Amino acid sequence: MPASGHNPQYSLGSTDAEHERLIWQSSRIAPLTERLFREAGIGPGQRVLDLGSGVGDVAMLVARLVGPSGEVVGVERDTHSIARARARVAESGQRNVSFTESDVNQIANDTPFDAAVGRFILEFLPDPLAALRSVSRLLRPGGVLAFHEPCYAPFLLLSAHLPLWSASVSLIHQTLLRSGANTEIGLDLHRIFLEAGLPGPAMRMEILLDSDPDFTRWTHDLLRSLGPQIQQQNLSLEPLGDFATLPERLQAEVAASKTVVPFVALVGAWSHKPIDQVPL
């Protein structure tokens, strides 16, 4: 459960600006997610469930892996996000992706899935263990569960040498914590899989490092999306100075240090539903 003990909520909202941030973010981490899914065994002809689809990036990635003979069903509870996801899929020409508006614990399904995937979804759920159990019931015996979730501890540690960058990522972290997100859920996936009745997952942690302006812009844009929650959680952007110039000041700090800065650590975990468990 989240360290704060509150019920988690998606703290980043569903504005057009947040959608653009998600699309950019996905473009940077897509190779890591694709490698995870390939290693998990997701491939041509499979029927795959994508949890918390957002604006559709993971669903479209999986659609390429399963090919025209496969199918991807994305589940998302936010109407605005689903509309954007559907528009993007239509524009891409992919015909093997559909989206349904639903809570992840209330998915209706008559045909078992071959796999269930998700990225940055379990961290925001009030009971990720219950969600994993629920989703597992929708899979065929031997089906794959593969998730990409965050671990903020290395993100904070590797930012400590830069005062402004450290203050910025610490504010992101504190806002998510107070909103109820489990910011270290990546390292908790082993326990969650086991308690869900699944074999211990194969796991890996990866951290992207860079120093380009787009990377520092990501921090600014994440703080912008968190703005309402920052205020609601009695935190403040004021210690960071003029918010409009934050990207330039962050980039100047990184350049002056002649070092790189991290993206949040990504923990990938995947396992198979036991053969003797039949779908419900």
Question: How should each PLM-predicted stretch be described?
Answer:
Residues 11, 15-18, 200-261:
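C-terminal helical/coil "lid" or tail adjacent to the Rossmann-like core of SAM-dependent
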Residues 27-46, 61:
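Conserved alpha-helix/loop element of class I SAM-dependent methyltransferases that forms part
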